[in-house]
A protein has these predicted regions:
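A hydrophobic transmembrane-helix motif
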Residues: 1-10, 20, 30
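Cytosolic ends of transmembrane helices, especially the final helix of ABC transmembrane type-1 domains
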Residues: 15-43
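Conserved E/DxxT/N motif and adjacent residues on the DHp alpha2 helix
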Residues: 42, 49, 160
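Flexible, glycine-biased helix-capping/connector loops in cytosolic signal-transduction modules
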Residues: 46-49, 189
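Pre-NBD coupling/linker segments of ABC/ABC-like ATPases
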Residues: 49-59
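ABC-type nucleotide-binding domain
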Residues: 59-259
Length: 259
């Protein structure tokens, strides 16, 4: 066998190896894509259980009433709330304290209509919440969770998410009320600082305060704070609470704490 023939054979083998390898690679990708597409189709075909039965615009004042409210989670059959009754008017604050799993967050989820009650009724301004425009109701709720979600965007845009057309002065004012303005201006790019995934650029306390600013700037009729100061030191917490007392004077406020 001549050297040229051997070289020619090796070149042909090399040329054929890549296409054969690609066939196996593409086959694997197609199988993964089919599984992903099936999951996407399942998600897109999901029908929301909570439906909006009214598209009429309305003015919300913020009075919230629970009448004999009972709620049971269908998937676990656990009754989180049983015969709950209370009324809170605009300008009032309701503190909800309790151990983990006692139903504190369930109350908030029912007010936001993430779930509907199993029994009893919830009234907003003396009207059944189920019969009100769902979008209007949620637009008038400012919610600050314990574990805030921030986008991979600038701090400014994360705060403006609560109010898209907010002015620079409104953004700064909201940040000051949340006692995070001083931290923001310490960054090289200030409010233009781009955050990492889920806000990893900021500390836990800073993320919570940016989330508070986002809720405040929205100027909703109902404010909900779900243990949102758990990562903040005592001195800063006192300053924030003092500011929130001023901001929420005419609003219905819910404060949840595990303490």
């Amino acid at each position: 066998i001549q050297i040229g023939v051997v070289v020619e054979f090796l070149l042909y083998v090399n040329i054929l190896t890549w296409p054969v390898a690609v066939v196996g690679w593409v086959t694997s990708m197609v199988q993964e894509a089919e599984a992903s597409q099936a999951r996407i189709n399942e998600f897109l075909n999901e029908v929301p259980e909570i439906k909006n039965y009214n598209n009429e615009s309305l003015e919300i004042h913020g009075k919230v009433t629970f009448k004999d409210v009972t709620f049971t989670y269908e998937d676990t059959n656990i009754t989180a709330l049983k015969n709950i009754n209370f009324t809170i008017n605009p300008g009032e604050t309701l503190a909800i304290l309790g151990n983990t799993g006692s139903g504190k967050s369930t109350i908030i989820e029912l007010i936001s209509r993430l779930y509907d009650v199993t029994a009893g009724s919830i009234l907003l301004d003396d009207k059944p919440i189920k019969k009100l425009n769902l979008n209007e109701v949620r637009n008038q709720i400012g919610f600050v969770p314990q574990d805030p979600f921030l986008f991979s965007d600038t701090i400014e845009n994360n705060i403006k998410f609560g109010k898209k057309n907010a002015s620079e002065q409104e953004i700064i004012e909201a940040a000051k009320n949340a006692v995070v303005h001083e931290n923001i201006i310490d960054f090289v790019h200030g409010y233009k600082t781009i955050l990492g995934e889920r806000g990893v650029t900021l500390s836990g306390g800073q993320k919570q305060r940016v989330s508070i600013a986002r809720a405040i700037i929205k100027n909703p009729k109902i404010l909900i704070f779900d243990d949102c100061l758990s990562a903040v030191d005592t001195e800063t917490e006192e300053r924030i609470l003092a500011n929130l007392e001023k901001v929420s004077k005419s609003k219905t406020t819910f404060i949840i704490s595990h303490r």
